[in-house]
């Protein structure tokens, strides 16, 4: 018989005070004005389809499917879709946290094409719970958000 055993301590390397502020799933259509805006929370922006640009503090960045953009609070940004390949994306607003990046910017764009199955799974799970609103969905959403943040901190 082969067995693997794992034990866990009560000490956690970090605690999260993250609170799900809002969440949206969008498909770009011609009526979106792409107006630069800010939020009082951190925004996780995951591109599920299409391509376009992300404007962050007057800098343009190309984005496409399986890119994750993390924007800390109070940073001006907006998305701009390409008509030939319209953007579909998830946004998750998270209160109580902000990220520190190696280059000391207040945002980061990650190419997640190699790890997309893991991150996209958490975004899909979160939105499935929010859509269906089955008993206990709020708790599942909180835990899914905690797992997503732990994955991002790696």
Predicted regions and their residues:
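Amphipathic alpha-helical segments enriched in hydrophobic/aromatic residues interleaved with Lys/Arg
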Residues: 103-152
């Amino acid at each position: 018989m082969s067995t693997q055993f794992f034990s866990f301590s009560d000490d956690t390397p970090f605690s999260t005070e993250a609170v799900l502020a809002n969440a949206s799933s969008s498909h770009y259509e011609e009526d979106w004005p792409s107006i630069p805006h800010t939020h009082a929370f951190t925004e996780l922006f995951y591109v599920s389809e299409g391509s376009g640009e992300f404007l962050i503090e007057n800098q343009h960045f190309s984005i496409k499917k399986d890119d994750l953009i993390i924007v800390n609070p109070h940073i001006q940004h907006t998305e701009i879709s390409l008509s030939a390949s319209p953007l579909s994306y998830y946004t998750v607003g998270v209160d109580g946290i902000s990220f520190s990046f190696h280059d000391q910017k207040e945002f980061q764009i990650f190419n997640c094409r190699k790890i997309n199955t893991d991150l996209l799974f958490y975004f899909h799970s979160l939105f499935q719970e929010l859509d269906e609103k089955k008993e206990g969905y709020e708790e599942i959403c909180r835990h899914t958000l905690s797992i997503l943040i732990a994955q991002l901190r790696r």
